[in-house]
Amino acid sequence: METIKRMIWPKKEIFVGDFATGVNRTVPVNIFQLVCRVVLRYMRTGKIECDSDSMTKFIVELLKTDCAAKWEWFMKRRQRGDYIVPLSIASIPIIPLLSYATRVRAVSVKAFGNELSFNVRVPRPSVPKKGLLLRLAAGLALAPICALAVYATLPREKLSVFKLRTEARAHMEDEREATDCLVVEPARELKGKDGEDLLTGSRLTKVIASTGRPRRRPYAAKIAQVARAKVGYLKNSPENRLIYQRVMIEIMDKDCVRYVDRDVILPLAIGCCFVYPDGVEESAALWGSQESLGVKXGGLVRLPGVVTQINRDIPSDVLLPQEVLEVRTGPPNAKDRNIFMVAGCPSQARFLVHNHCLKNLKRGLVERVFCVERNGKLARTPQPTKGAFGRLSPFRKAVCEKVGVAHRLGYDGFLSYYSGAKLRTYTRAVESLHITPVSERDSHLTTFVKAEKISTSKGDPAPRVIQPRNPRYNVELGRYLRHMESKLMKAVDGVFGETTCIKGYTADEVGAIFRAKWDRFDKPVAIGLDASRFDQHCSVEALQYEHSFYRAMYPGNKLLGKLLEWQLHNKGKGYVPDGTITYRKEGCRMSGDINTSLGNYLLMCAMVHGYMRHLGINEFSLANCGDDCVLIVERRNLKQIQRTLPEYFLNLGYTMKVEQPVFQLEEVEFCQAHPVQFQGGWKMVRNVRTAMSKDVHCVNNIRDLATRRAWSNAQHHGGLALSAGIPVVETFYSRFKLYDVPRKHQRIDTVTNVHKWRGSGGSYVVTPESRASFWAAFGLTGDEQLALEDRLERWEMDLFGEEGVDAHEPSILDSAVA
């Protein structure tokens, strides 16, 4: 038995650095898979299908399909000799009920004038008078066995073929067309010279559909109708032909049309897409407005800051004995913030900014630091189970072995990493540290409301707060960690065996990384991991696990241990014009800490690595950007991950949501950007709706002309560097005017809105392939892209005129939420 188990379920080795974990772990027998294999061997589907969550549902669904296939054969395709064997088996239970007596019968035959006579014994069945009950019992015992045998021998076509015909009906007008159009026959497995599988197209199918020459044109017309129903009527242009081609390839993949037929069907179907009914070609509304709608000049609009209308207190059972939140109300003399917007951009989304006032600060601390909302009520963040982070120690050991022992930076070495305003701040902190050493008071938090763009579509969200510590504390801790950040990232990449920590790369490099990750898999699926308020869920145990990485690099360092211990017991104050707030909090990541980014990378990578190790899945790829992650796996592992991941992370104290899986590379969303193919390869492109709505808003005070010029220059240069060769977005950023950069301007670094990825720039043109890829990523067809670009070309900015009012005109983007 053990030998059979080893043959069917081989042991899987999981390596963490140079250490193998889980080698001797016995893989339990999966009864569900075993029953599936046995049943499917009879059903002859040719593959293991595991779409149901329970064995009962799986078997019932399979039996329904089998019964439907046999019934369809009986009603539509039966022939005379099909049911001889089932009827013969059905008569077997009657045999024991009969008694056979013989009688002699004389038979005479005349041949060549002679008559020959001989006796023949003829059996005569009859119902016996004795032993009837015994014979009846024997017949009843045989009845269920024979019934199963009759069902098993009933004729039907192969189930995979039956399913193919059933799915084809979705693309046909009636059942006869689906049956006549698709004649299914076994496919050939293509092998290379070394015996490897050769993939021609998107996938290699075991069963393919052969469309004979007379049937190719009707099938091409049908899939053209389906493609037009999905995408709409488009102009006959190269980019739109590519869009139709992608949709029709997906349809033929689903119908399992063989590749030799696709070569003939695809051009016919693409041509059919541009054959319009009478009157359609004259309808200009189908192509989008190419005429000027009287676009107004893009003047500045000033929008005042907002104050939250929700006031909630912390429940008494949430705070620990050592935790406190004290609110002191002052005179109502709060100042309003302003957010500036350039009017006339074709985007409906609008953004506001939270004022720095007591009401906003209190709600931000209550809902983003102390409490989470659960079932409509405020509650404490979930806490990890005992020993949960101890199971992640193999990952830490592997990373620390690659990093080794580190040495602390000097003050000058730490300052060399900074420039501008931060350099001046840290220089003053270093001068102070030469006089007075760091103390526990330097770890106290100063809290304020973040000036963040808030979408009006989100209602009244809780304001975000920033909680920096004293620069003196940041200098001392930064001397240990600032120069080790990149080394730790590379060590994590080494443990995963590929680029995992996406930091410090250009948008082009990140796009190439995702292309390489996607190509690693035969049938890839990408799953977004959405950590709800990741910083808030960092418990004391999670922070201690993160700190163990740093302690391992500096073994026995008492000052580092003291600095890290102060992060576990936080004391802070928030000063606003209309009051103050004093609080104490155990655990929780403070957004102003110098190790916030590095710590989030380490925690997320460790938890995902431990989770995949827990499942025993070796084939996976992770892209991590702090609390934003994308996990790429084989499609066969999808349901297992969707079912088990939230519970695993909840045991670690994190609320993790598994987003909807995507099966196309362009559909992957990572840091609000999608991979898009362009002339130079692949590039991560920000969501067009987000970019065109957020980037016309500025939360900084740009009332003076010099700051406006600096902001416009930054948007132009930075935007084009990130979007060269990309439809729509490149045109959008080119509309920001270029001005002479002022020689001396102290606030230029605060208005540039630098994105987390650097742009590589370059001179590229928009190709039909990039428009098709852009459509796959954001759902804008080639015609819609051209209409938006035409609209943007007529959009003129006027940053130096009088402040106006918001003027919005309808556009293609209005139907989507930014």
Swiss-Prot record:
Domain RdRp catalytic: 524-641
Transmembrane spans: none
Pfam families according to UniProt: RdRP_3, Tombus_P33
Domain of life per record: Viruses
InterPro entries in alphabetical order: DNA/RNA_pol_sf (IPR043502), Rev_trsase/Diguanyl_cyclase (IPR043128), RNA-dir_pol_PSvirus (IPR007094), RNA_pol_HCV (IPR002166), Tombusvirus_p33 (IPR013707)
Enzyme Commission (EC) number: 2.7.7.48
Catalytic activity: RNA(n) + a ribonucleoside 5'-triphosphate = RNA(n+1) + diphosphate
GO biological process, one term: viral RNA genome replication
GO MF annotations in UniProt: nucleotide binding; RNA binding; RNA-directed RNA polymerase activity
UniProt keywords, alphabetically: Nucleotide-binding, Nucleotidyltransferase, RNA suppression of termination, RNA-directed RNA polymerase, Transferase, Viral RNA replication
Other known facts: Readthrough of the terminator UAG occurs at position 297.
Family: Belongs to the tombusviridae RNA polymerase family.
Protein name: RNA-directed RNA polymerase
Organism this protein belongs to: Tomato bushy stunt virus (strain Cherry)
